[in-house]
From Swiss-Prot:
Tagged with keyword Transferase: yes
A Pfam family the protein falls into: Glyco_transf_90
Binding site for UDP-alpha-D-glucose: R224, G225, S226, R227, T228, R232, V271, T272, L273, A289, A290, S291, F292, R293
Gene Ontology molecular function: UDP-glucosyltransferase activity; UDP-xylosyltransferase activity
Compartment list: Endoplasmic reticulum lumen; Secreted
Site (Interaction with the consensus sequence C-X-S-X-[PA]-C in peptide substrates): F120, R227, Q254
UniProt record similarity statement: Belongs to the glycosyltransferase 90 family.
Record protein name field: O-glucosyltransferase rumi homolog
EC identifiers of the protein: 2.4.1.-
Enzyme class: transferase
Any one GO CC term of the record: endoplasmic reticulum lumen
């Protein structure tokens, strides 16, 4: 596959760089422009196109498929997250300091206990779904599980090592990542999914079934979502200017009060995950933290454009830019987005190859079995770091 893609890249580069004659044509490294050509003309993209070709070629040359055995595709993440505690382990004092940052759980005698009040019951329930089957394998331990959207332990604010489990973080945080509750239940609640997305196992089946053949997909970019941040505005504005290139519109969220909240337009209707599969190019933006939508988009066998690389979930590092998805800088302008989308419209084989690799990776390495495997590895290795005798907290309830 890499050999074939390499041929496509080389042939495409040769077309771009062939304009070297003296008959009014520019040299390869010059900016090829025609005074009568539209400012959005194809020749203005040549520098960007070279950049994209080179990025894809470099990424593929250095790519080594991960080992799917025993969820090892995600092993480096777990190793890095637990590294701060490797030398001296986890002490009772650390747990006491961590309690303010999340929900307190205990595993005692292969039973699970939790503080009575849970800020987000569906999220706690999703966590407990994955922990309960592992109880016969686990030693006694205290766990502080953060079910909020935002990570808690900033590396520059916290001088002490504090073990808090969170589903998502950036490089600025030292939280220990766990597979989110939303693999089972909870997640963003919208009208179409009033109790949250949940049930990754079922979505894997329904979205894949809804995926249209590549040729049948509309060759345009697509996005639906609320205006969580203005990082999404450039794509929406491009859509309004060039609806044949992009269909990107804002939907309502709980804070919506007027069209001003949807960039001075009426909110669009929400669409199911399956409806996304009609389109060849799908954009993913972060929300408050990492996007729950991200993993679902790959199941459409469409090309995923992932905006920003700051926010992570446990499985993100196994996905490689330009190999499995197209990376997009956070503050891209409408013009930059236009160039990127147009490139993949005009280089359909490259787009399809990246889309297929992205689908295969998620399908093969983010099964529910992989999620359960990661939970198992996480809790067993975490348990080995406990350096004190865990005593039952009588204020906790069995769950």
């Amino acid at each position: 596959m890499h050999f074939i893609i390499g041929i496509v890249i080389c042939l495409s580069l040769s077309v771009i760089q062939s304009n070297t004659s003296d008959e009014g044509m520019c040299m390869a490294k010059e900016q090829c422009t025609d005074p009568e050509e539209s400012t959005t003309g194809r020749s203005l993209y040549s520098a960007d196109y070279n950049k994209y070709f080179n990025a894809i070629e470099t990424a593929l040359a250095g790519y080594v498929a991960c080992n799917s055995t025993n969820c090892n595709c995600h092993a480096d993440v777990l190793k890095a997250d637990l590294k701060p505690f490797k030398a001296h382990g986890i002490t009772k004092e650390m747990i006491n300091r961590a309690k303010q940052y999340g929900t307190h759980y205990q595993v005692i005698g292969h039973k699970l206990y939790r503080q009575r009040e849970c800020m987000f019951p569906a999220r706690c329930s999703g966590v407990e779904h994955f922990v309960r089957p592992l109880l016969p394998l686990l030693p006694d331990m205290d766990l502080i599980v953060n079910c909020r959207d935002w990570p808690q332990i900033h590396r520059h604010w916290s001088k002490e090592k504090i073990p808090v489990l969170s589903f998502s973080k950036t490089a600025e945080y030292l939280d220990i990542m766990y597979p989110a509750w939303a693999f089972w239940e909870g997640g963003p609640a919208i009208a179409l999914y009033p109790t949250g997305l949940g049930r990754w196992d079922l979505h894997r089946q329904t979205i894949t079934k809804a995926s249209a053949d590549w040729e049948a997909k509309e060759p345009k970019a697509f996005f639906r979502g609320s205006r969580t941040s203005d990082e999404r505005d450039a794509l929406v504005l491009l859509s309004r200017a060039q609806p044949s290139l992009v269909d990107a519109q804002y939907t309502k969220n709980q804070a919506w009060k007027s069209p001003q909240d949807t960039l001075n337009a009426e909110p669009a209707r929400e669409v199911t995950l399956e409806e996304h599969c009609r389109y060849r190019f799908l954009f993913n933006f972060r929300g408050v933290a990492a996007s729950f939508r991200f993993k679902h988009l790959f199941l459409c066998r469409s090309l995923v454009f992932h905006v920003g690389d700051e926010w992570q979930e446990f499985f993100y590092p196994s996905l490689k830019p330009w190999v499995h998805y197209v990376p997009v800088p956070v503050r891209s302008t409408p013009e930059e987005l236009e160039a990127l989308i147009t490139f993949f419209q005009e280089h359909d084989q490259l787009a399809r190859a990246i889309a297929e690799r992205g689908y295969e990776h998620i399908w093969n390495h983010l099964r529910m079995a992989d999620v359960e495997c990661y939970w198992k590895k996480l809790l067993k290795r975490y348990g080995k770091l406990i350096r004190y005798t865990v005593e039952r907290d009588s204020t906790l309830i069995e769950v």
